[in-house]
């Protein structure tokens, strides 16, 4: 089964380019959003495996969205997706904020690929982060998604 993702970015051209790239690589883009309110609605409705969140969402912050998604998942169990922060800026510009965020990791937009997303999620799994469980094959499995692996088949 393909990894399902939600893309969150305030740049329509990037959203379309990312959708084409990720779908060509076997990932299923379940939806897109351009702001926090839209992202929360889409995340609850679509229940994606991973949410790619641009750090700069116009007047809003991707860090704030990551915190809201983490709180929503813990409280209401409505959103159980990993967040990967993305940006055109270098990771070093946000090192402390990324470390303090509940996101699974950071990915520069220039390195966006299904393989890199899987690497981030698998690295989190190997680190023993909560919310994940090991399946018999040793591949990462998402709770509530039987038979789903982070690795592309």
Question: What is each of the regions a protein language model found here?
Answer:
Residues 9, 54, 87:
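Active-site residues of response regulator receiver
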Residues 12-31:
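Two-component/phosphorelay signaling modules centered on CheY-like receiver
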Residues 32-50:
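Acidic, metal-coordinating helix/loop segments flanking the phosphotransfer/catalytic sites
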Residues 35, 61-64:
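Acidic catalytic/metal-coordinating carboxylates
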Residues 58, 91:
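The feature encodes the CheY-like receiver
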């Amino acid at each position: 089964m393909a990894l399902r993702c939600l893309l969150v970015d305030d740049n329509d051209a990037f959203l379309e380019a990312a959708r084409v790239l990720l779908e060509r690589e076997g990932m299923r883009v379940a939806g897109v959003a351009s702001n926090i309110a839209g992202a929360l609605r889409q995340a609850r409705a679509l229940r994606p495996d991973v949410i790619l969140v641009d750090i700069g969402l116009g007047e809003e912050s991707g860090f704030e969205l990551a915190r809201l998604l983490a709180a929503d998942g813990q409280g209401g169990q409505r959103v159980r997706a990993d967040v990967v922060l993305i940006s055109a800026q270098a990771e070093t510009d946000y090192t402390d904020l990324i470390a303090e965020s509940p996101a699974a990791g950071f990915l520069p937009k220039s390195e966006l690929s299904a393989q890199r997303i899987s690497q981030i999620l698998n690295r989190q799994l190997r680190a023993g982060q909560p919310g994940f469980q090991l399946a018999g094959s040793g591949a990462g499995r998402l709770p509530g998604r039987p038979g789903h692996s982070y690795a592309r088949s």
